[in-house]
């Protein structure tokens, strides 16, 4: 297709002027001089990484994780921090709920000596700290726990019973506008943990909604709905939760997939159990009766013992995980045993529409 040389000349002139004024890379052709692959950080769950399509949560984007109480929201974000720190990245935790347990974080593999932590007094202070860390370009992952705890200054200084209609929503809307561009420039991953509330008077559809207004829903590249679906028992003792995560929104890959995994109390996501299950499904691990074998060598009787063997032999665990990732995250194949194509009962939070 021929182009008008005068138009081409004018375009090159204006592109040069824009780059001179706003910096190199401020405008470019979509397929030119840039990698189309999004850099990601693992969530700690292989099936969730596969359900997300890109192998984890995307850098330079906003992510929202919401769900009921004790569903595993903070655990999931701590797993992300642990994975990021293993890659040498700097992480920060904005603890607006004042409830972060450093002992539990350490058990999940978080290097608490190198984790930046802030417990702000107001919502504005929390978001300003977020913005300052982002603009510095020195922090790679920021967690805000939680949006519901980001209390506007006017509400804190006022009295209980005072009406502050829409204050938190306006605060979040302004913060999103300010943060979105800075996050892209600094390639910082910002994760907001959010809580669920019930809409009053909703007779049809889903009455659930998230706090902080609609701005976060629009600006988030990924939204994850995390729910506890059952208990894991060792005889009569409950030792963990069966957990399901639905990818409600995804701007980097196909949305509406879901992943199921286990969260063990005091240990976090049962990643070795996932490896055993996925390894069997994709024929990397042989199962004969109750026995599991890898490359002809028995690794344990029963899933728990096979998982224990992988913990004690990290090189074999890494080998299986690498093989599974290359198998499941290449050639467009994005579905694993714990990551399904459709989220069956996935419901839009606003309309109540079932996907």
Swiss-Prot record:
Tell me, what is one Gene Ontology molecular-function annotation carried by this entry?
ATP hydrolysis activity
Does the record carry Cytoplasm as a key word?
yes
Which positions in this protein are listed as binding ATP?
67-74
Q: Which HAMAP family match?
A: RecA (MF_00268)
Q: Which UniProt keywords apply?
A: ATP-binding, Cytoplasm, DNA damage, DNA recombination, DNA repair, DNA-binding, Nucleotide-binding, SOS response
Entry-linked PANTHER family: MITOCHONDRIAL DNA REPAIR PROTEIN RECA HOMOLOG-RELATED, RECA
> Pfam families recorded for this chain?
RecA (PF00154), RecA_C (PF21096)
Locations listed in the record:
Cytoplasm
Can you say what this protein is called?
A: Protein RecA
Annotated GO CC locations: cytosol
Q: Which InterPro entries match?
A: AAA+_ATPase (IPR003593), DNA_recomb/repair_RecA (IPR013765), DNA_recomb/repair_RecA_CS (IPR020584), P-loop_NTPase (IPR027417), RecA-like_C (IPR049261), RecA-like_N (IPR049428), RecA_ATP-bd (IPR020588), RecA_C_sf (IPR023400)
What is the protein's known function? Can catalyze the hydrolysis of ATP in the presence of single-stranded DNA, the ATP-dependent uptake of single-stranded DNA by duplex DNA, and the ATP-dependent hybridization of homologous single-stranded DNAs. It interacts with LexA causing its activation and leading to its autocatalytic cleavage.
Q: Has UniProt tagged this entry with the keyword Nucleotide-binding? A: yes
Return one Gene Ontology term, BP aspect: DNA repair
Q: Which family does it belong to?
A: Belongs to the RecA family.
């Amino acid at each position: 297709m021929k182009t008008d040389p005068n138009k081409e000349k004018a375009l090159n002139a204006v592109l040069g002027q824009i780059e001179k004024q706003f910096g190199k890379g401020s405008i470019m052709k979509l397929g030119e001089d840039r990698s189309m692959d999004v850099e990601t950080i693992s969530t700690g769950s292989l099936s969730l990484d596969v359900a997300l399509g890109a192998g984890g949560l995307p850098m330079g984007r906003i992510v929202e994780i919401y769900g009921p109480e004790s569903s595993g929201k903070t655990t999931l974000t701590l797993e992300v921090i642990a994975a990021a720190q293993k890659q040498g990245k700097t992480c920060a935790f904005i603890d607006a709920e004042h409830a972060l347990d450093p002992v539990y974080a350490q058990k999940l593999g978080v290097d608490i000596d190198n984790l930046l932590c802030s417990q702000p007094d107001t919502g504005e202070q929390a978001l300003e700290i977020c913005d300052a860390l982002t603009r510095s370009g020195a922090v790679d992952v920021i967690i805000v726990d939680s949006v519901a705890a980001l209390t506007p200054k006017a509400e804190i200084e006022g009295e209980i019973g005072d009406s502050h209609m829409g204050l938190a929503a306006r605060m979040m809307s302004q913060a999103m506008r300010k943060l979105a561009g800075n996050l892209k420039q600094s390639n910082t991953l910002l994760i907001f943990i959010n809580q669920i509330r019930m809409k009053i008077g909703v007779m049809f559809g889903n009455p659930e909604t998230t706090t902080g207004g609609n701005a976060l829903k629009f600006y988030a590249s990924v939204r994850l709905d995390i729910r506890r679906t059952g208990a894991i028992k060792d005889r009569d003792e409950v030792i963990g939760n069966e957990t399901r995560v639905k990818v409600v929104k995804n701007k980097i890959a196909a949305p509406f997939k879901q992943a199921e995994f286990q969260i063990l109390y005091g240990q976090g996501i049962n990643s070795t159990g996932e490896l055993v299950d996925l390894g069997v499904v994709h024929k990397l691990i042989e199962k004969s009766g109750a026995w599991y074998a890898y490359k002809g060598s028995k690794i344990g009787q029963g899933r728990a013992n096979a998982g224990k063997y992988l913990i004690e032999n990290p090189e074999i665990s890494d080998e299986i995980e690498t093989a599974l990732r290359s198998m499941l995250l290449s050639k467009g194949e994005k579905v694993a045993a714990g990551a399904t194509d459709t989220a069956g009962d996935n419901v839009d939070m606003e309309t109540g529409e079932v996907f």
